[in-house]
Structures are given as C-alpha cells and as structure tokens.
Amino acid sequence: MSYPGKDKNIPGRIIEALEDLPLSYLVPKDGLAALVNAPMRVSLPFDKTIFTSADDGRDVNINVLGTANSTTSSIKNEAEKERLVFKRPSNFTSSANSVDYVPTNFLEGLSPLAQSVLSTHKGLNDSINIEKKSEIVSRPEAKHKLESVTSNAGNLSFNDNSSNKKTKTSTGVTMTQANLAEQYLNDLKNILDIVGFDQNSAEIGNIEYWLQLPNKKFVLTTNCLTKLQMTIKNITDNPQLSNSIEITWLLRLLDVMVCNIKFSKSSLKMGLDDSMLRYIALLSTIVLFNIFLLGKNDSNLHRESYIMEPVNFLSDLIESLKILTIEYGSLKIEFDTFQEALELLPKYIRNGPFLDDNVTAKLVYIFSDLLMNNDIEATTNIQFQSFWDNVKRISSDILVSLFGSFDQQRGFIIEELLSHIEKLPTKRIQKKLRKVGNQNIYITDFTFTLMSMLENINCYSFCNQMKDIAPENIDLLKNEYKKQEEFLFNIVEHINDTILERFFKNPSALRYVIDNFVQDLLLLISSPQWPVTEKILSSLLKRLLSVYSPSMQVSANIETICLQLIGNIGSTIFDIKCSTRDHEDNNLIKMINYPETLPHFFKSFEECIAYNETIKCRRSATRFLWNLRLGTILILEEYTKDAKEQIITVDNELKKILEQIKDGGLGPELENREADFSTIKLDYFSILHAFELLNLYDPYLKLILSLLAKDKIKLRSTAIKCLSMLASKDKVILSNPMVKETIHRRLNDSSASVKDAILDLVSINSSYFEFYQQINNNYNDDSIMVRKHVLRINEKMYDETNDIVTKVYVIARILMKIEDEEDNIIDMARLILLNRWILKVHEVLDQPEKLKEISSSVLLVMSRVAIMNEKCSQLFDLFLNFYLLNKEAHSKEAYDKITHVLTILTDFLVQKIVELNSDDTNEKNSIVDKQNFLNLLAKFADSTVSFLTKDHITALYPYMVSDEKSDFHYYILQVFRCTFEKLANFKQKFLYDLETTLLSRLPKMNVREIDEAMPLIWSVATHRHDTARVAKACSSCLSHLHPYINKANNEEAAIVVDGKLQRLIYLSTGFARFCFPKPSNDKIAFLQEGETLYEHITKCLLVLSKDKITHVIRRVAVKNLTKLCGNHPKLFNSRHVLHLLDKEFQSDQLDIKLVILESLYDLFLLEERKSVRNTGVNSTLSSNSILKKKLLKTNRVEFANDGVCSALATRFLDNILQLCLLRDLKNSLVAIRLLKLILKFGYTNPSHSIPTVIALFASTSQYIRHVAYELLEDLFEKYETLVFSSLSRGVTKAIHYSIHTDEKYYYKHDHFLSLLEKLCGTGKKNGPKFFKVLKRIMQSYLDDITDLTSTNSSVQKSIFVLCTNISNITFVSQYDLVSLLKTIDLTTDRLKEVIMDEIGDNVSSLSVSEEKLSGIILIQLSLQDLGTYLLHLYGLRDDVLLLDIVEESELKNKQLPAKKPDISKFSAQLENIEQYSSNGKLLTYFRKHVKDT
C-alpha cells in the first residue's frame, strides 16, 4: 500500500515518528486522547438525496453491506459521483517555508486508487469554506470508553463511569456527571430520531441505520444496534435518568428489537445462512434485555412476546449449535455476543420481572436441556470448549435464579432438571465435568446446579428482615426454620427417590446416573463450601440402607450395586471420622451432656463461615452454612431448655448470630486470613459430627457385617470389599469386636469367593496376624484359589513376624502343602521352604554374624516344626529326603548349594546342642529347645545324605556316657545309630569304648532307648568285626530269662508280675530283633545247633504268652512277639504265632488287642518307609512332569515283606473294623489309625472298610469325624462307585454306632448324613444318586414295620436317628424332598391306622398294653413330625403331597427355596416325644396329636 511521502525521508507511521520527535508534533494531545478512546469511525458524507426515498430502484446486497472493503463500489455509484471537496491543510503555506523539501506534485507517491479519486475531484478550498460533515459509526467490537463528546458534531458518549466527577473531553471542556447523563439522554433521542418514535417516523431509508432484507423487511444494522446497546447501558448505569425516559420510547425500542429478531429468524429460515443476521438478532436480544434492566416496573414492558421472542431465538440458536460444522474462529463474534446475551438473562430474572408461568416454564425447558446436553462432543478447540462451558455455566445460573426468584415454581424446576438425568456423562471425562473451587474437584453440571438451588432454601432473608430480636420474632423465626427444613427435606427425599427409582427400573443401563451423583457428593462432602451435601448424602444413604430391609424386594444386581455405593459413602464417612481431631467427634447428645464442648463447636462454625467469606465463596453456600448453624442452635435450645447453664450459652449464641445479621454480616472475619484449607476442613469435620450423616456410620457397619452372613455370594463379596475400604484407611477397624467375630465366622464360609475376599481384607496393613489361626483353617480348602491365597499369606507372615510361635505355626501349614492335589501349590510350598531355609542362608555365607543369626532362626523353626505332630514329622522327612536331597529335582549348582547349606546348618546344630548341654539350667524353654534340636539332628542323621562327620560324633560322645536321665539320651542314641549306618573307619579304641558304654548302660535303658541302642550295638560290633562281646551280653540275658521260661513250662500260674522279667523280655527281644540275624559263630547260651537267636526268643515268648500266665506278662510277651515278627516277617508264617494272634483277637482282652494293633502299625509304617526309601521320590507328589514320566518307567522295588503286610491286614481286618467302633474313643483311635494306614497303603480291598468309615461319621468326637471324612474323601476320589454301593450298609452301621456310643441322647447324633451329603451328595451327577440311596434306606426301614411285633426298641431308636439326620440334610430339588415326604406320609397314615385299630375309641378297651404300643406310636409321631418339620423348613404347603406321578416328575428341575434360618433342631421335638413316653402319657399325647392333625 502506498501513502504520501513513501520513499522519502519522512516517517510513515506514528510509531516511527516517536523515535525522533514527540507525539504532539504530529497529533495534538487532545486529539490523541480522543483518537485512542473514541469507539467510532468517520465515514464520507452522503448526499441528502440518498435518504429521500427507499424505493429508488437500488437493490441492497446485504452481503456487500456486511463487508468492510466497499470503497470501489461506493465510488462507482452514480449517487456518489458528485464532486468531493477536499480541505487544504490550514498551515500549508507556513510549513512550506520552514522545510527544506516541498513536493511540487502532491500526487507523487500515492497509490493508483488515491490518484484516480483525486483526479476525478480536482480543486482545493480553504478550510473555512468547508462545512464539516461527519458521521459516527460504532465498531461492533468496541472496547474503549468515549471520553470526548462535542455537541455540534452529534457524537455519542458511552462512558461507563457513574461517579460524580469531571471528565476531560477532547475539546478541553469539563463535563459533570449531570452533563454526561444529559448527553446519554440526547444520544438515545438522536438514535430514536432515525429509528423512529413510532413506526411511521422511522427513517428506514437511512442505510447506515436500517438494512433491507430480501423479503422487503427492514432491520437495524449492527452499527446502530451497537450504538443503541452502549447507550442503553450508559443509561442503566445512571439510575437518575430512569424518570426521564418515557415508556413509549422503550416500548418502541422493544418492538423494533422483537421485529429485528423475527425478521432475522424468518430470513434465516428462508435459507440465508448469513452470520450478520444472527449477529443482528443477538445484538437485538442484548438491547432488549438491557432495556429490561432499566428497572422500569411498567407491566407493558414485560409482555410475554418481549421475553419469549428472544428466548425462542436463543433456543433455536442453541439447537443449531449442536449441528454446527463451521470452525469456531469464523463465528467467534457471534459466540461472544450469544454468551453476552445469555449473561443478561439471570440478571433480568433476579431483578424480579413480571414473568408468567408459561415464560418461566419455557425458560426452564430450554436451559435444563441446554445444561444437561452432551450431544456436542468434546473438541480440541480450547476456545470453543471454553465457550460451551460458559454457556452451561450461564444456563445453570439461569435455573438457579429462577429457583431463587419463583418459590411456587421450585418443584417444577427440580422435576424438569431430574427428567434429564439420563443425559449425565456415562464416563467421568474431565472435559464433561465442571471444576469447582480451588481443590481441583470436578463434578457434573447437574449436581452443581441442583446444590446451588437447594442452598437458596434458608432463613437468611427472613432474619435479615427481622426488626429486632424480640421473643415473638424468635418464635416466628423458629416456625420459618421448620417450614424451610420441611420443604428442604421433602425436596431432597424426592430427588433421591426419583434417581433411585429410575435406577431400579433399569440398573444395568442407568448405573452411571447414580454413580455420577454419589461420586459428586463424596467429592464435596468434606468442603464447607458445599454444606448442603450433608443433607442430600444422609438422605441418600438412608434410602440405600432401606434396600436391605425385609419389606424391600429388589434384584440381586441392584442389591450389589447399592452395596457398592453404600461402601463408598461409608468409606468416606470413616475417613472423616478418622481425620477428625481428637475429642471433637461430638454429636448433639454428647455436647448436651458435656456443655464445655459447645464454645469450641460454635467457634468451628464461625471459622468455616469466615473462611467462605474470605475466599468469596457463593453467597448462597455461606448463607446455607449459616442456616445450619442457626438450626443447630435451635435444636440445642430445645434439648437444653431444662438446663439453665446450657440454655444461657445457647441463647447467647442465637442472639449473637442474629445481631451479626443485623450488622450486615454473617460473622466475624477470619482471625488468620492465611488459614489453610486443611485446617478449616478439620473444623468442618467437627461440625459434621453433629449432623445425621456421620451418625449413620454404625447402621452402615452393622449392615455390612450382617450381609457377610447372607447366602448370596456376590453380596457377601461386595460387603467384604466395603470392609476392606475401611481397613485400608485404618486397620483398627478389624479389631472391633463385632468385626472380628464376623471375620472369624466368615473365614469358615463355604464360598471360595467370599473366603478369598476375606483373605484380601485381613491382608490389609498386615492385619492377618490377628487372624492367622482362622486363616489357616482354610489351608486345605477345596478351592485352589483359596489354598494359594492362604499359602501366600503364610509366606508373608513368616517373613514379617519375629514371633517364633507364629513362624512355626505358619511354616508348618506351608510344609503341609508339599502334599496337595494341585502341582502349582506343591511347587509354591517347596519354593517357599527352599528360599527361607536354604537359599536365605546361602546368601549370607560371607557374613559370619548374619549367618549365625539366620542359621539359628532357621534351626529353631525347623526343630519345632519337625516335632509339631506326626504329620509334620513325616512331611519334614519327605521334604528333606525327597525334594532337597533329590538330585533329579534340582540342577547340579542348586543341589550343591542345598547340601552345602545343610552341612553348615548341621555344624550350627551340633554346636547349639553342645552349648545347651553345657549350660546348667533347668529352664523349661531351654530343655524343650535342646530336645527339639536333638530330634532335628536325628532327622539330619537319618537323611539319605550324611551331614554328620566323625568330629560331630566325637563332640556328642560325652553325652552318651553321661548319667543324665532324660529323653536326650534317646536322641543321642538315634543320631549315633543313623550315623554309624553311613560312616565307617572309626578308630578301634573309640568303637571299643562306645561298645563298652552301650553294653554297660543297656540294663538301665527304657524300652525306647533299647530299640535305638540294640541296632547301634550291632553296628559298632560290625565295625569292629568282633561280635563276641555282644554274644556274651546276650548269653547273660538269656541265662537270666530261662529260669522264668522253665517255670512257665512247668507251672504257668507260678509266673507273677515281675519287673525284672519284663526287662529281660524287652532286652532279649531287642537282641533277637537287631543282632545275629543268622546263626552265630560266637557261642550264645541255650541256642541249639543251627538255631537263630530270633527263632529261640520266639519260642520263649510263645511260652510266656500261655493262657494261665499273668495278664501283664502275657501282654508284654505278645507285644514283643509281634515286634519280633515285624523285624523277621517270616515268623508270621508260623502257625503257632498266627494261632496266638487269632486267639487274642477272639478274647475279651482289649489291651492285648490294642498292643497287637500298635505293633502292626509300627510294622506297616516301617516297611512302607523302607519301600519309600527304595523307590525314592515317586512316593511323594511331584510337580515335575518330566520326573514323573521317568519314575513311572521305573518299577516299584519289591521287598520281601510286601505280601506279609497285605496278608496280615486282610486276616485281621474285621477285628480292626470292630475295634474302630469302640465306645471308648481313645482306644478306638488305635484301630482307626491302623485302618487309615491300611487304606493308604492299599493292603486290602477298600469295599470292606467303607461302611465302617461311614459309620465313624456318627462319632461324638470331632477329631474322629474329621479323620473319617478325610479317609472317605480319599476313597471317594479313587473308588466313587464303591462308596455309593456301600452307602446303605454304612448308614445302617452309623445308626447302630450312634445308639451304641450314646444310649440316652442317641438321636442327637444328627450330623452324619449331612456330612455324607457334603462329600458325595452334591452336584448334578451325585446329588440325585445320593438322594436315591437315602430314599431306599428310609424305605427299607419303613417296610420292616408291619405290625406291633416288628417295632422293638432297636427299630424305634434307628428311626429316631434316621429322622434327626434327615432333618439336617439340605435338599436342593423339590422332587427329592417331595418323593421322600410322600414315602413318609404313606407310612404315617398306615401306622396311624394300625395304632387306632389297637386302641379303639376308649383307653379302657385296649387290646394290648400301652408298653407294647409305645414303640410304634413313637415311630408314627416321629415320622409325622418330620414331614411337618421339612414342609415348614422349606416353606412348602401340604398339597404338594397330593401331586400325581406326572406332576411329581416335573419337580425335578425346580429348586427349593433356602432353609428358614430361625427354626430349632428337630431333635428337640423328639426329646419332647420321649418325655411323654417316660411319663406314661404317650397314648394321651398321641390321641391329642391325631385329633389336632
């Protein structure tokens, strides 16, 4: 672009001129000020003929008029071709003389356009001959205030400043506020001159003010509307002008604005998508609302059309925004104007306009929809997103303004807003939420608006209008408060009910609605800036809690979701309670009881209100918080009216806050203006304790705990998760007695998912230490998931605790899992033990102190686990020998690490034993540790790899020769025995001394020590290659024994109880068991040529086992004979031995039978152990599949005694089974233990044993029932068909066993059928089979009852036991129950007829005695009561017994309802019947019973 002076040394722009010269050189000061501030531009004057007629034939192109660059077209217009007269610069001549260069050609350097214009209009005149004509056109985006106004130029001033001060104008003339006001009024009149004071006076030909549309309608131009907008605004800011403005002017303007909007809308609908038309309509809307804001109360100004037209236009524009495809940048001015128009609407509403219900409804409909609209997707354009957020903000403000201004419409507004809740965002994306406060909290617009509305329900305005604090006014205030509270309560209840009802109707689709609402409330509950949250949330929580009341019937899905919501709310409440400062958790009752807490409570309220005031929080929120304070005071006043001291404090507080209102405030300023929100939040938490929400914590907790006992698994799992949320905040919650007891119960729950959730719960913050025993009740659970979880928890507990008792307990449970049906669990358990016992030691080999510490800890744990019980001892041996010391299970490097660490541990172990023995202490713990260490050392010595060295043996030898009488000597003997079996090349002197010591101490040893010492003596003699001394000792023993043998042969009764004889029997048997297995070369007294020692001792023992030998000696002899046979199994082939054993089992000598069983047990165990050692790892469960395949290819090593063990088990099985069912439980355990071993090793056909195992289910001993359950469970996995075929015999045996073990309360043994059902009667496959067998058993018993002669006491007792057990079974199918009930019902009717036939109509005519009738009557009553009991238990009606066969078969797929939990046991009814029988009133009771039924 060219300009005058281009390419010359003259500044072309002001900024360039300022570099060298002051600004005033180019532009006068006053002119510059006007230039900078004036929101106008000067256009070229038009000839008056332009305005003469609107019908001059010109077609106005609105698109051309809307553009800025229209210069060329204006020049070419004929109406503008009249010569333009240009003003000559007034100082041209003088300035020409003062410069060096004066251009001779003024056209030089001008653009072609400028030159063409000047050439057309030639000639210059002096300025005095030129009349100034200018026209002001306001820019649409004017942002500056006009400070200069000249009256002769007709300029308009738009100064916003309303202060009464002088304003400097560009003319240098000062103007007062009154002058400005007058100027504003003149501006309005000037505009009205052209717009017209009525329709006829409008200068529609003025194209600067009027724009003709294609439909021949006229609308005001954007320039005119901008001027008008600024003028109205200036007038609005000057209230003194209100009376000077005539209503007719405003009505005219309103009419024009409405027409502008109408005509623009109609043109847009015709297809003219012109942004200028929308802009005109928006500006008209702004002007219209600004007119409303003038404060004129004339009803004519508030016609429905005036408000509805702009509102409808805005509504249409909103709809078009939803489908807008144009870029935001091209519509920025329109969007800004639209936003400005909307912002005026809430101001208008708050001014108290004359709005009828139709208008209000329209506004509510439009802006509720706009607020909740999510059709417009989130855009990447930040400006557009900001615009849309502002629109929603204003929409919310409009709705809140309507709610606050129109009390009668509040319900409708809330209802309309609730109708849009389905439009809430399905995902909580930040762009779809609104940020509130400075805490980076985002909530939905719905919640924000709803809460902003409800905050307006308070008594602040009422209090503000009170003239004084008189008693009568206080009473009025109380009534007003109750009224407001009631309204708030009802509306909150309605909101929550509506949201929940929508959710209940379609929980899957509308879950996001309730989730969003609750999430918003939880985010705001801790802030004093949102006090109404407490009211909404407490109401919602109560409503959610009521879902679980008996009167509510909802789906399981709804229950689960509601529980999740309750859990989130409860967790937040618990968080608040935990965060509250000490001694500030005071509810109203507590504050009444402790009035000293009141001042601090009121102070907390003051702080929160002052904080809200300081941060400029919403006035409605602060007022609602103040209202809460007022309500609390009124409630306290009601509660404390009888306490003088307290009532004074409360009354003073009430007067104080009311006086503050009269003084124009809500309370004193914040003492510490820099107070942190975290401090204020704690004050607010203290306040919350006085309200309902936090007091709902206890009902919430009780609900959670009660739901843990529900049958619905998902509900229980969710309840546990709720509890977990609390525990994650503070694990102290788990120490709550109520919670603790519930966890204990639920850890025994049958549901795997619930157990898993409980285990997660108790794992929070290592809380499992309080429940470790209950946790490990599930270490052998049916669920793999639960077993793994328990294993992981045990691992953590072992690592985290320093308590040796806990360590031993949990590591023992880990050890038990090296036997499991799941390979992964076996692997886990093995690795845990390997890491803790081996690799952890290996890691610190280069740190002596650490090594000693860790080794000591490992050894202490190992030693205690190894002796914990028989099972742990066996598993420890298995783990040591068949995993750790199994080369096939490890790489060479890993195996070397293991053996190296075990060698080191052995060193420390021997050292520890030596240290403990050297201490002269009698402390119990020290003695126990020493015994445990020796036992562990014995296990190390007995392992497949030798870790003990000669040095170790040498170090332990002094304890061998000591005279100390304790168990230590036994373990030392065991260690030496095992070591000598592996080591060789001992010094002869050491061997000789050791042999001397052993032989000399032999007579003083007890039975256990003899069993260890004899093999050691023989081993030492073998190492010495000299058995002469042993032979001599044996001869000595026999020489003392034979006199007794001779006496027994001659006179059996002459043998009496003799301690010496008993010892000789044990010693001689010991020599025979472990020494001289073959005929000896050394001379042994009394042995014949070729006779072995064990054969000779066998003969001696058979002599001492004769019938007339005293019982004690016979028992010792039989015991030792059986042991001897165990070491030399060929002896069991002796007919003399077998005859003796058979005879003993047929006798009544229980103790001898048990002795034989114990010996057989030792034999079987020893032989199986040998087998395991020979076969190796395949005797344990291996998780290594490659190893399994390898081992399966290896045939099991046969051993000589295999057939003997099986033959013995088979021969004596019946005797063993009989002894299992002894009434004396302690003695029966011996037989049960042997039976378990026989079944485990597979020595006999299990079908013979299964009925007895089933019978043991009826034992009164929980331990025996547990053992029986484990046995049958194992059998069921292997031989399912055998178990089912044995059920009938097993149940019959169980019934007899129940009667046999408890003659008085036999019928209370009511658990064996339910245990059987749990094991083999569940599932689609086994359930029907089990119930079929059960029905057959019942039928067989009932069929045997035909008449009086078939009903003896045994039959009656059997029926009783069967009935009580059936009552505890859990029937699943209706068919199973109904078919059984029909069988029972038919029998009861049949028996009733038999009885009635016998007794006749009167008692005196009895054909038989009542005693003979008692059995059949008891059976009939028990069966009838059982049928009634089962019907009631499952909630069935009597008519199910009338179903025919077809109808009955249809019940197979119908499940029964759950059992009623509050029904007493059936055995109590049988006890009642038996009492009538014992009192001789049975017949009378039967008659009454028959009559009643």
Curated annotation (Swiss-Prot):
UniProt GO MF annotations: chromatin binding; cohesin loader activity; sequence-specific DNA binding
Effect the entry attributes to changing residue 67 to E: In scc2-8E; mimics constitutive phosphorylation, retains normal SCC2-SCC4 interactions and chromatin association, but exhibits decreased viability, sensitivity to genotoxic agents methyl methanesulfonate (MMS) and hydroxyurea (HU), and decreased stability of the MCD1 cohesin subunit in mitotic cells
Subcellular localization: Nucleus; Chromosome, Centromere
Region of interest: Disordered: 151-170
Mutation effect (residue 320 to E): In scc2-8E; mimics constitutive phosphorylation, retains normal SCC2-SCC4 interactions and chromatin association, but exhibits decreased viability, sensitivity to genotoxic agents methyl methanesulfonate (MMS) and hydroxyurea (HU), and decreased stability of the MCD1 cohesin subunit in mitotic cells
InterPro entries assigned: ARM-type_fold, Cohesin_HEAT, Nipped-B_C, Scc2/Nipped-B
Residue windows of the HEAT repeats: 695-732, 734-771, 806-843, 1132-1169, 1244-1281
Keyword Secreted found: no
Effect of residue 305 to E: In scc2-8E; mimics constitutive phosphorylation, retains normal SCC2-SCC4 interactions and chromatin association, but exhibits decreased viability, sensitivity to genotoxic agents methyl methanesulfonate (MMS) and hydroxyurea (HU), and decreased stability of the MCD1 cohesin subunit in mitotic cells
Residues modified to Phosphothreonine: 67, 231, 236, 360
Modified residues (Phosphoserine): 43, 74, 127, 157, 162-163, 305, 320, 753, 1179, 1182-1183, 1185
Keywords of this entry: Cell cycle, Centromere, Chromosome, Nucleus, Phosphoprotein, Repeat, Transcription, Transcription regulation
UniProt modification remark: Phosphorylated at alternative sites Ser-43, Ser-74, Ser-162, Thr-360, Ser-1179 and Ser-1183 when the principal phosphorylation sites Thr-67, Ser-127, Ser-157, Ser-163, Thr-231, Thr-236, Ser-305 and Ser-320 are mutated to alanines.
Pfam families for the chain: Cohesin_HEAT, Nipped-B_C
Source taxon at top rank: Eukaryota
GO biological process terms, semicolon-separated: chromatin looping; double-strand break repair; establishment of mitotic sister chromatid cohesion; establishment of protein localization to chromatin; mitotic chromosome condensation; mitotic sister chromatid cohesion; protein localization to chromatin; rDNA chromatin condensation
Record-level GO cellular component terms: 2-micrometer circle DNA; chromatin; chromosome, centromeric region; cytosol; nucleus; Scc2-Scc4 cohesin loading complex; SMC loading complex
Function: Plays a structural role in chromatin and is involved in sister chromatid cohesion. Forms a complex with SCC4 required for the stable association of the cohesin complex with chromatin, which may act by hydrolyzing ATP from SMC1 and SMC3 heads. Binds to the nucleosome-free promoter regions of ribosomal protein genes and tRNA genes. Involved in transcriptional regulation by cooperating with the RSC complex to maintain nucleosome exhaustion at its binding sites.
Domain remark from Swiss-Prot or TrEMBL: The N-terminus (residues 1-181) is sufficient for the interaction with SCC4.
Known partners and oligomeric status: Interacts with SCC4. Interacts with the cohesin complex, which is composed of: the SMC1 and SMC3 heterodimer attached via their hinge domain, MCD1/SCC1 which link them, and IRR1/SCC3, which interacts with MCD1.
Misc. remarks from the entry: Present with 3310 molecules/cell in log phase SD medium.
Family (UniProt): Belongs to the SCC2/Nipped-B family.
Name under which the protein is recorded: Sister chromatid cohesion protein 2
